[in-house]
Amino acid sequence: MTESYSLPDLVEAAAEVRKQAYAKFSNYKVGAALLAGDGTIFSGCNVENSSFGLTICAERSAVTAAVAAGRQTFQALALVTEKQGAPCGACRQVLAEFCGDEFPIHVAAAEDLGDIKTSTLGELLPDAFRF
């Protein structure tokens, strides 16, 4: 299902949840806002852990919140990071489980929410593993 959505609202939701990020070790805070097929926005932030491998990225936090609420189709993702950092490989693969290659990923800089870089999942993860 594809509906129109307000990109500024999606970015603002990501900026708001970024404030809740627990980035004690890296100080690199990320907020994610995932737009479900029904128009609901699910937010997530990164949560670091002293055992670094247990850190949860903002994107996966948003996806798991959405799935836990019964949503499995998504329209778009907005991220707010310090310097428009792209999703890590693990997050790209998790998104590929639910989203096609044309799924839009919008990344805004925390200092300027109007500075948005848009890519598709397929551009960021060509030849994604799909079982």
Region locations from a protein language model:
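Short acidic-glycine loop/turn motifs at beta-strand connectors
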Residues: 36-38, 111-112
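Short, well-ordered amphipathic alpha-helical segments that serve as non-catalytic structural scaffolds
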Residues: 13-16, 58-66
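C-terminal binding/interaction regions
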Residues: 2-23, 71-131
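Short beta-strand scaffold segments in enzyme catalytic cores
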Residues: 27-36
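Alpha-helix C-terminal capping segments
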Residues: 35, 64-71
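Compact, glycine-rich, soluble single-domain proteins
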Residues: 46-60
